[in-house]
Amino acid sequence: MILITGGRAQGKRAFWEKNIASGEGEPSEISGLWIRGGQTSFDECLDSPYVCEFHLFIRRLLLGEPSLNAPDWVYGTMEKRNGCRLPDREALTERLFKACPGRVLVTDEIGLGIVPLDPFEREYREETGRICCLLAARSEQVWRVPC
């Protein structure tokens, strides 16, 4: 897996398409293959080799959004906290690696700046950071794009 992280609108996908994906086709061919975590189903996100907006996928998991169609195993035995359905982080990251080991995953780095007053927003930042740390620890490459 290759994890690419950075601030919002920093050109993370374009960085991948232009500088790294040279052996996988033209950038225009690859740009149509991205699955958006804020819009896709759980299974599509699990199986896709190119996932962007992964932080929004995690947000949807925490909200228990019905359109995500997340299976029950992803939540494990964790209870709700601050309005969040907490996922089983280890099971989720394991499944992501097993389903598509060569995946390129792009996520926004959302843990910087002022800590939000809203308990859900704090929980969202914390869970996203912890899941991304687990992914980074096992990824072949981790790129931080600071533009």
Describe these PLM feature segments.
Residues N19, E24, P66, E121-Y124:
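Alpha-helix termini
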Residues M1-G38:
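Glycine-rich P-loop/Walker A and Walker A-like loops and their local beta1-loop-alpha1 context
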